[in-house]
Every structure is written in C-alpha cells, then in structure tokens.
Amino acid sequence: MRDNTQHYRELFLEDTPLMDVRAPVEYHKGAFPHTVNRPLMNDIERQKVGTSYKQHGQQAAIALGHELVCGAVKAERLAAWKAFAEANPNGYLYCFRGGLRSQIVQQWLKQDAGIDYPRVIGGYKALRNFLFETTRAAVDECDFVLVGGLTGCGKTEVIAALDNSLDLEGHANHRGSSFGRRATPQPAQIDFENRLAIDILKKRHRGVGQFVLEDEGRIVGSCSLPLELYQGMQGYPLVWLEDGFEQRVARILKDYVIDLRSEFERVVGAEEGFAVFSAYLQKSLAGIVKRLGGERYQRLAAILVQALEEQGRDGSVETHRGWIEGLLKEYYDPMYAFQRQSKEDRVEFRGNQAEVIAYLRQRQALRPS
C-alpha cells in the first residue's frame, strides 16, 4: 500500500490525479486543476450533518452521516470512488483537512472494495496553503518585469512567446478590458489563484527566476490578482511595447470581432452564438457610457449596430473598424497616456514586438544564477 502523503510540491509538479471528497458546494468554491469531485456527502447531507455537529456534537453527527449515506446511496458513491482509484492508481484522495471524511472513504474502499487508497494529509487546506506560500515566496525571491503598451499592441502575443511569462489573462480566462469576456466562464477566484501558483511552481522548478507579466490592474474581469503580487507590480520595471495604429485596429478586429464571434458560436451554436456575441459587444460598450459621455457613446453605438447588422447579413467586418478606431482615439489611448505618466520612470526599454521579445529573452539570460 502507498503511504498517505504530505509531498504537496510533487503532487502539483506531477499533476497527480486527486479525488476531492468534499461536498459539491465546497468544490465549486475552489479546487485544483487535476482534481475530480467524488463527494462523500452531497450539499444537503453535509448541511444536515453540520447542523447536527453544532447542536449535538461529533458522535451524533457521525451517526447521522452513516444514516444518510447508506444502502444504494453508499453503493453508488463507492462505485464512483472505486472507478477513480482503478483509473488512477497513482492518485490520492482528500477532504477539507484530511480528517474524518477522507478517512471514512479510505475505510469504505478498503472494507467494501478491497482497495487501499492513500489520502493527502492536511487535505484541501494544506494544499491551498502550500500554493499561497508558493506565490508569496516568488514575489519575495524572484525578479519581475512588466509588459505595457496601448490597447491592441499585442502584449498577449509577447507573453505567449516567452517561456518565463505568467499569463494572468489566460489564467483568468478574460482579456482584462471592458470588452475582455470570453465565451466560457471565468474560474472561481480560488481556482484562478491556484492555477497561477501552480504555473509559478512549475516554472521555478525549471529554473525560472525572472517572470514577465502583462501590466494589469488589480482586477482581471472578476478575478483579483493576489494582493502581494499586485503590490509588487506597482514598482516593477516596465517594458513598453509599441505598434502602429492600423496594426492595433486590425489586431482588435481579429481578437474581439472575428475570433470572439467564432468562440461564442463554438460554445452555443451558430445562430444563438452570433446573437449572444452581438449582445455582448453592445453591453460592453454601454458599460463605459459614463466614461465616454452620452454623445460619443451614441455615435459609437450606432456604428456598432450597423457593423453587427452587416456582419450578420454577409459576414463583412469592415464597418467594425469605425467604432474600434473611435474607442482607441477617444477613450483608450488618452487613458493610457494619462496612466503612463506615473510609470514613466520605470520604463527601461521601448520597442516593437520583435525587439521587446528579444530584449526580454536577453534580460532573462543575463540574470545571475
């Protein structure tokens, strides 16, 4: 039999399969990328047992748990645990603290299925704390540099080209702007933090000691950056990415119109996908109406409506350039120019995409071991 484990680092580095036996409501608040939820109790059962524990103590709660999870219910859950254990002989199971729930699942697997299956000592809480400390330690011990630039200049492409980058927007499943939503939902806050920490852990294991991040605000869609990381970002050196206006318009047209429409249609189907995509763009523009001002908003909204009608009718996207150009010239570029004033003394390099990528690679290579 394999031993229970406290080797949290290896679990994440090796993407070890984990069976989370917490209730679904706990799992959906936060889990880990390589886990599946095979609960001992469902949400209602957990609530009843919790109430019994508060009112009558541990023994009464345990007795109620055995009463609720018995017969066909127990057999069904045992079959799910057995299937996971057989499919993942190198895996582990865990509950919140590695205590009673995971021990009961271990006991039932042994007694009723003849399977010895190890658990994670300390459970979810210990794994979560380990990842929290992973991020904190990286902020304390590693070097960081930010990539900034005007909207549409290709910062995400720079991040993707580097092997020492942390893709904050990728982990958040959001592009970070008022128009940044994707066709699929964002992760829960805890899931976002866990994914980022695992990325940091794996890169540091490969020897990365200098990380490149996109210059972001504290909030990426609905996901908040870890506070210690965001605080550090207020002082990290900055590399400024430059690109021509027409190139930026073309990139935004591709990302936020052509590709995003396709993304929505893949998720919900062609007809409904275009309708959802159209409503999303209009809602996003309406979301910044106060910052645009009424007259400017009405003008850009009219162009957007016309562009969507043409796109829906014959696939043409050229009219979209009108509202994109207007947003850049009249909203995003002035806003970035204002924000950049406070960061100017931190800019250590400026260049186009190829120059910035080359500079950042050289910067990493020159870092002392």
Curated annotation (Swiss-Prot):
BP GO annotations: tRNA wobble uridine modification
Nucleotide-binding as UniProt keyword: no
InterPro entries: P-loop_NTPase, Rhodanese-like_dom, Rhodanese-like_dom_sf, SelU
Entry keyword set: Selenium, Transferase
Active site: C95
Domain Rhodanese intervals: 12-136
Catalytic reaction list: 5-methylaminomethyl-2-thiouridine(34) in tRNA + selenophosphate + (2E)-geranyl diphosphate + H2O + H(+) = 5-methylaminomethyl-2-selenouridine(34) in tRNA + (2E)-thiogeraniol + phosphate + diphosphate; 5-methylaminomethyl-2-thiouridine(34) in tRNA + (2E)-geranyl diphosphate = 5-methylaminomethyl-S-(2E)-geranyl-thiouridine(34) in tRNA + diphosphate; 5-methylaminomethyl-S-(2E)-geranyl-thiouridine(34) in tRNA + selenophosphate + H(+) = 5-methylaminomethyl-2-(Se-phospho)selenouridine(34) in tRNA + (2E)-thiogeraniol; 5-methylaminomethyl-2-(Se-phospho)selenouridine(34) in tRNA + H2O = 5-methylaminomethyl-2-selenouridine(34) in tRNA + phosphate
One function term, GO molecular function aspect: tRNA 2-selenouridine synthase activity
EC number(s) given by UniProt: 2.9.1.3
Taxonomy, superkingdom: Bacteria
Job of this protein: Involved in the post-transcriptional modification of the uridine at the wobble position (U34) of tRNA(Lys), tRNA(Glu) and tRNA(Gln). Catalyzes the conversion of 2-thiouridine (S2U-RNA) to 2-selenouridine (Se2U-RNA). Acts in a two-step process involving geranylation of 2-thiouridine (S2U) to S-geranyl-2-thiouridine (geS2U) and subsequent selenation of the latter derivative to 2-selenouridine (Se2U) in the tRNA chain.
Family: Belongs to the SelU family.
Subunit field text: Monomer.
UniProt protein name: tRNA 2-selenouridine synthase
Lineage: Bacteria, Pseudomonadati, Pseudomonadota, Gammaproteobacteria, Pseudomonadales
Gene assigned in the entry: selU
